[in-house]
Amino acid sequence: MQVGVLAVQGAFAEMAAYWRAQGADTFEIRQLADLERDIDLLTFPGGESTVQGKLLHDLGLFKPLKDRIQGGLPVFAVCAGLILLAEKVEDAGGRPGVRPSQWFGVLPVTVRRNAYGRQLGSFRTVGTFDGKPDVPMTFIRAPAITDVLAPDVEVLSTFDGAPTAVRWRNITAFTWHPELNT
């Protein structure tokens, strides 16, 4: 399996290592030419969603990536990646956040940035993921999914009653960092 790891900012090295440990071949996506390779799975790492969104626009990657996602390319997104994909984004106070043009808007959920607090609010816990109990979950400045906007969005895990991982069509997205729990 060929996994393209978005590598413009954030924890892309950890994401690539995670997929290599699963037996995948990985390569970094940093420029438009990188999208010419065969990609079986596109991954969005954790990091700073505002910076990632700006860089994707500046590098000319935003529209080609959005077209591939909307065309059905499988996507695995973590934390900042979830924020970039969400249909609606709120700031930590629940007010509309980042400009809509800065995110993809392809995943029918509402997310709240930094919902569990800033860096000092980061934590580890265990939970059930996709029916598997006792799965370690690491939350780092994590967003929260505050609303699921389509009936066919599958909730894969929850924390304190809020969805923390979802699957919709070709997109699987996490508020927590599965790549840090292997």
What are these regions (language model features)?
Residues 8, 78-80, 107, 141, ...:
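A secondary-structure boundary/capping signal
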Residues 113-182:
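Amide-donor transfer/coupling interface in amidating biosynthetic enzymes
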Residues 49-127:
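Cysteine-nucleophile active-site neighborhood
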Residues 1-4, 103, 170:
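Residues that mark the start of a beta-strand
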Residues 1-71:
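N-terminal beta1-alpha1 cap of cysteine-dependent amidohydrolase-like domains
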Residues 26-27, 75, 171:
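Hydrophobic anchor at the start of a short beta-strand
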Residues 43-44, 77, 174:
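Redox-cofactor binding/interface segments in oxidoreductases and associated redox assembly factors
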Residues 28, 77-78, 166:
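General beta-strand structural signal in soluble alpha/beta enzymes
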